[in-house]
Amino acid sequence: MVVMARVPRPERPDLVFEEEDLPYEEEIMRNQFSVKCWLRYIEFKQGAPKPRLNQLYERALKLLPCSYKLWYRYLKARRAQVKHRCVTDPAYEDVNNCHERAFVFMHKMPRLWLDYCQFLMDQGRVTHTRRTFDRALRALPITQHSRIWPLYLRFLRSHPLPETAVRGYRRFLKLSPESAEEYIEYLKSSDRLDEAAQRLATVVNDERFVSKAGKSNYQLWHELCDLISQNPDKVQSLNVDAIIRGGLTRFTDQLGKLWCSLADYYIRSGHFEKARDVYEEAIRTVMTVRDFTQVFDSYAQFEESMIAAKMETASELGREEEDDVDLELRLARFEQLISRRPLLLNSVLLRQNPHHVHEWHKRVALHQGRPREIINTYTEAVQTVDPFKATGKPHTLWVAFAKFYEDNGQLDDARVILEKATKVNFKQVDDLASVWCQCGELELRHENYDEALKLLRKATALPARRAEYFDGSEPVQNRVYKSLKVWSMLADLEESLGTFQSTKAVYDRILDLRIATPQIVINYAMFLEEHKYFEESFKAYERGISLFKWPNVSDIWSTYLTKFISRYGGRKLERARDLFEQALDGCPPKYAKTLYLLYAQLEEEWGLARHAMAVYDRATRAVEPAQQYDMFNIYIKRAAEIYGVTHTRGIYQKAIEVLSDEHAREMCLRFADMECKLGEIDRARAIYSFCSQICDPRTTGAFWQTWKDFEVRHGNEDTIREMLRIRRSVQATYNTQVNFMASQMLKVSGSATGTVSDLAPGQSGMDDMKLLEQRAEQLAAEAERDQPPRAQSKIFFVRSDASREELAELAQQANPEEIQLGEDEDEDEMDLEPNEVRLEQQSVPAAVFGSLKED
């Protein structure tokens, strides 16, 4: 049933209620200022016709005009009602008016302003929308403007109205200056490049600016350079040249790009000569090869494009004489640029390090064939390079400069250059010494021998103030008198051109200054020997020995002793012995072998045999362990030759005690072999028995085979059994050592059957021992397998009528280890009586009787 109620006022529409509405109407009458009651009523009427719903909202807002909830729902519902209608429908105007009425009370609500502005944007009413945005910004506090501006800017960018957008952005940047990049991008897109460049320049100069896009100051600067250099006709308000040159001093690691940008600006502006000047300035100022390559390639490309453009213009308009001259000029300019590249690149490297000697030499080579440029380059080099900062050897510049004059026949100029070089305060004495040597070689090349000697004597003369060679506080001119390089050259010249006394004086002076080397000492002694001053030469050796210690004195001693023996032989034997003892006193083991052999040779040839043997004996103790084996071999050989092989027994015993197991084993075999040759079988067997203790049967099978062959030849069944017993004993000893080592390794790394980490937490202690026992049992089983099986005593039943063959078979089964000797040996043993011993007569080797060497 529908209840119709008329309102007495004519402007108010009739209110129509349904029976379901009465409870809500009654509640509203009781609480007409309750928002919740009205919202419940509105929620209930959501399915009602739109006019009825709007009427209900209007009734509620008339009583509660300041309710944000009611206005928000009402406006949202009104916008939804016209969403699918044409924007020219009058209903849109009603909704707009509804929003305007709402802002009478809700002008501080940014959400309503945003919805209204978006609604107007959808209608396409540009001016009305812009004014509404402005009203919203005026109505809202400044703290809420950040909610309006994103939509406002989107609205400005959505219409091709650059002036309106620019004005809006300018206002926005006052609120948010950090968003300047967004404005700059818009200006670029709208082709307002002049203002974009201005804004970008402002941003670059602002040190406090932080890019929202994460760009560095250099990236922004690079954008500015690209913008102003590529659009010279559109950017008029900025001084492009000053801006880019300011960047050259600011961003020194990107000079190549900035120079190219500046040249590109002038090229696009049509100022080609100015662009060429910029390129020339760039290639003369850049400091890195990368920047130079970048600028040079751009420069070459520019020249190529100019030539191509000129040729294209000439082909289109016809060639004239003036055009040909201009084209030839451009081609010549381009060729000159290409030919200058190595020199320009060298200039870049010298700007990086003007004290780089090698680069100066390369620069001279680039001027090959142009003497004036070479002289200028050398002059600039020697004036620029600081010897204390130089990379390389600075004296080579002076030497090469003088050599250039010499090659061109200007000897006086070359001498002047070298004379100036001798006055330069070099960092190292060796540099000045090299200059003096070059002075001498210059005179020698032109056969001015006296002048060469004069120069070197001048170089080695004592200065007014003496200084130590390595005293860096003194100039090198005061220290060059101790330079071995100059003295060596002077000594060579004196030997070739001077007298005996002058040469001797030079060598004596070298020794007095204590700057000699072992080779200098030997040369001096050889020089004296050539002139038959033998004792003087020996004194020279003595002076050299006093200057050096081991190992530097090794060559001097070897030469000295050799020369002394060859000179005197056995005539001054005691003096020779004293020299050897002096040489061996403090001699390192590494160098002792040669001296001992020389000493022993002296005693053998001129002295006593027992002295020689004593020297060999000392040598075996004095040399390095690695040389002891060789020394013992020599000792044994010489002892056998002098005294006979029987005298070598003590040497063998000592060698076996001293040498390592490997060499001792070899000595034992040789010792035993010698005893066999002498017929001392028991001695040889004792040696084999002793040596067996250091012979593991698993690795030294050759030794055991040798012993076995020995026993087969010279032994019997008992000795062979003893050998086998010893072998088993030794093998058991080595197996025990292996088992012990394996158990120790097992504690660290675990066994192959498992590890403690694999066990349960509660069983680690017990299973640790279990694993060790398993591993020990396994190793013991392997050792037992390696040993020959033991004889097992068995009880056999033998018939009384058993045949001889059956008894032999049972005996073989009862003792499988019984040694089967050959048939020949069995027959020999059967011929012998139990108490008989076979005696063999052997000849004594001639080596037993030694003697001294005959003269």
UniProtKB/Swiss-Prot annotation:
Source organism superkingdom: Eukaryota
Ranges of biased composition (kind: Acidic residues): 820-834
In-chain residues carrying the UniProt-annotated modification N6-acetyllysine: 420
HAT repeat ranges, renumbered to this chain: 15-47, 48-80, 90-122, 124-158, 160-192, 198-230, 235-268, 270-305, 369-407, 498-530, 532-566, 571-605, 643-677, 679-713
Keyword list, A-Z: Acetylation, DNA damage, DNA repair, mRNA processing, mRNA splicing, Nucleus, Phosphoprotein, Repeat, Spliceosome, Transcription
Residues the record lists as Phosphoserine modifications: 851
Gene3D superfamilies, sorted: Tetratricopeptide repeat domain
Location of this chain's protein in the cell: Nucleus
Main location: nucleus
Listed Pfam families: HAT_Syf1_CNRKL1_C, HAT_Syf1_CNRKL1_N, HAT_Syf1_M
SUPFAM superfamilies on file: TPR-like
GO biological process, one term: transcription-coupled nucleotide-excision repair
GO CC terms, sorted: catalytic step 2 spliceosome; nucleoplasm; nucleus; post-mRNA release spliceosomal complex; Prp19 complex; U2-type catalytic step 2 spliceosome
Coiled-coil annotated spans: none
Location of the region described as Disordered in the Swiss-Prot/TrEMBL record: 808-855
Role played: Involved in pre-mRNA splicing as component of the spliceosome. Involved in transcription-coupled repair (TCR), transcription and pre-mRNA splicing.
Subunit record text: Associates with RNA polymerase II, the TCR-specific proteins CKN1/CSA and ERCC6/CSB, and XPA. Identified in the spliceosome C complex. Component of the XAB2 complex, a multimeric protein complex composed of XAB2, PRPF19, AQR, ZNF830, ISY1, and PPIE. Identified in a pentameric intron-binding (IB) complex composed of AQR, XAB2, ISY1, ZNF830 and PPIE that is incorporated into the spliceosome as a preassembled complex. The IB complex does not contain PRPF19.
Cross-referenced PANTHER family: PRE-MRNA SPLICING FACTOR, PRE-MRNA-SPLICING FACTOR SYF1
Family (UniProt): Belongs to the crooked-neck family.
UniProt protein name: Pre-mRNA-splicing factor SYF1
